[in-house]
Structures are given as C-alpha cells and as structure tokens.
Amino acid sequence: DRDSCIDKSRCSKYGYYQECQDCCKKAGHNRGTCMFFKCKCA
C-alpha cells in the first residue's frame, strides 16, 4: 500500500526522515518524503 509507512515512520520537523526513507525503500518504493510530519512514499 502506497501509504503504509505513514504510521510506522516518524518525520521530524527539521529534515531528518531516515526512518521514512528506510520504510519506503523496504516497501519497494524509490524514496520517502515527509509532508506535515507524515511519511509519504514515492
């Protein structure tokens, strides 16, 4: 699911989103980005 990382991966205020990236890559996406403190996979 495209948004399966939203709840699992925290996004901090100032650009550190390694957990989001890792979650998205494991899920087979190219990258993860944070929007409004939520992880989105792309």
UniProtKB/Swiss-Prot annotation:
- Tissue expression profile of the protein: Expressed by the venom gland.
The membrane spanning regions, by residue number, are: none
Instruction: Spell out the molecular function terms from Gene Ontology.
Output: potassium channel inhibitor activity; toxin activity
Task: Give the intrachain disulfide bonds.
Answer: 5-23, 11-34, 20-39, 24-41
According to its UniProt record, what is one Pfam family this protein matches?
Toxin_17
Q: Which residues form a coiled coil?
A: none
Q: Does the keyword Repeat feature in the UniProt annotation? A: no
Q: Determine the domain of life of the protein's source.
A: Eukaryota
The subcellular localization recorded is:
Secreted
One GO cellular component term of this record is: extracellular region
- Keyword match Chaperone: no
> Per UniProt, which keywords does this protein have?
Disulfide bond, Ion channel impairing toxin, Knottin, Neurotoxin, Potassium channel impairing toxin, Secreted, Toxin, Voltage-gated potassium channel impairing toxin
Q: Anything further noted?
A: Negative results: has no effect on voltage-gated potassium channels Kv1.1/KCNA1, Kv1.2/KCNA2, Kv1.3/KCNA3, Kv10.1/KCNH1/EAG1 and Shaker IR (with inactivation domain removed) and on intermediate conductance calcium-activated potassium channel KCa3.1/KCNN4.
What protein family is recorded?
Answer: Belongs to the ergtoxin family. Gamma-KTx 1 subfamily.
Comment field on protein domains: The presence of a 'disulfide through disulfide knot' structurally defines this protein as a knottin.
Its biological purpose is as follows: Blocks human voltage-gated potassium channel Kv11.1/KCNH2/ERG1 (IC(50)=16.9 nM).
Specify the protein name: Potassium channel gamma toxin gamma-KTx 1.9
Q: Which organism is it from?
A: Centruroides tecomanus (Scorpion)
